[in-house]
Swiss-Prot record:
It is an enzyme of class 2 (transferase). Residues 236-256 are annotated as: Linker. It catalyses: alpha-D-glucosamine 1-phosphate + acetyl-CoA = N-acetyl-alpha-D-glucosamine 1-phosphate + CoA + H(+); N-acetyl-alpha-D-glucosamine 1-phosphate + UTP + H(+) = UDP-N-acetyl-alpha-D-glucosamine + diphosphate. The keyword Magnesium applies. The gene is glmU. Pathway: Nucleotide-sugar biosynthesis; UDP-N-acetyl-alpha-D-glucosamine biosynthesis; N-acetyl-alpha-D-glucosamine 1-phosphate from alpha-D-glucosamine 6-phosphate (route II): step 2/2; Nucleotide-sugar biosynthesis; UDP-N-acetyl-alpha-D-glucosamine biosynthesis; UDP-N-acetyl-alpha-D-glucosamine from N-acetyl-alpha-D-glucosamine 1-phosphate: step 1/1; Bacterial outer membrane biogenesis; LPS lipid A biosynthesis. This is Bifunctional protein GlmU. Acetyl-CoA binds at N391, Y392, A428. It comes from the Bacteria. It is found in: Cytoplasm.
Amino acid sequence: MALSAAIVLAAGEGTRMRSNKPKVLHAFAGKTFLNRVMDSVAALNPDTLAVVVHFQAERVAEAARSYDEQVTIVNQDDIPGTGRAVQCAMAQLTEAGKVDGPVLIAASDMPLLDSETLHRLVEFHTASGNGATVLTTILDDPTGYGRIIRDREGNVLRIVEQKDANRSELAVQEVNTSVYVFEASVLTEAIAGLKSNNAQGEFYLTDALETAKAAGKVGAFAAPDPLTVEGVNDRVQLAALSKTYNRRVCERWMRDGVTILDPETTWIEDDVQIGRDATILPGSFLQGHTVVGEDAIVGPYTTLIDATVDEGAVVERSRVQESHIGARTNIGPWTYLRPGNEFGEDAKAGAFVEMKKAHIGNGTKVPHLSYVGDAQLGDHTNIGGGTITANYDGVHKNRTTIGSGCHVGAGNLFVAPVEVGDNVTTGAGSVVRHAVPSDTMVYSENTQHNVEGWKPAWER
């Protein structure tokens, strides 16, 4: 199945989104619409992948290039319409000598368009010997979509847009998905004769099918799952489609042995991996390339972003980003793990603890009310409540190292850079500014002053 070119249409503004950014750059399950469609199209290995841009052209082009540096960017001029977008693309690709064979065309506002559906569409097109093939689907409510008009033998006659359809045409439930395959020669001839005599005053790509009939057979392939070709035009549709899709994702994980108590409030993105017998509690968000191990418990009300949670670990009411949590380690409640943390096994970061670029050894516990940043803590060390590693001197971030088997008293302050050896005990309220050797007790001797008979100002 050789695909000469794939053209992704990403020129529109998407005015119904009421947004300052193009519709194709809105996110769906962790990726932009554009990147999701490019993912699916690229899986077919077209000889050339082109993206047509216009509204905020450079912004969209940059997003496309960040996905694929080799992508061909086509700038659509001010003449509106999908037909004009394809005219611009074909002119640029033909001039570069990059088109000779089947050409796939896809809109970029269908975040669930999948490579399997596209693969079957191209196979059907080739096997049927079509000059053009449109991907269709059947909808209970086809409002807003172009209708597929067939003759009595079932052949595709044309596609009629909603605003141009008469009453009988509006009753048709088979709709255009804005995904097509054309033979390059047929497409070139068909788009040459496009006109803008319609309610929108645009060059419709759909009109090319009528012209294509004269140059070759026109067929239609129905997508087996309407969800894969559902478009998003506004934020209401985005929310509805997101919810439907997320429910499917949760159901898939539940069938694979993961307990999800409330799929309605649990959100799991595509690249997340979850082990068997893990439990995801309500209000949890698993994002990016998060990995959750077997028997781990996540939630309730927890956000994991590109995090790794090993087997048997518990993360409760916390936010964890780009951090690794070792087996049977407990995080939370109300813990904030910023990027770069590495926990050993059987460790703990408890209530109201914030960490950043901290390496926490096996069995080491930071139970509550502490900040640990740019630090290394050895094995089986206990950090008292209210402890701070003062890592920033106004210019540089400095490291704190605390060894294994240490007992750090409450309210300690470590002024980095500073190193503390193994088996060290610090007194409550200590300020540690200098290196402490192993097997040492250190404390700061602060003088206590009592002022007898003291009254607050409002009682004087």
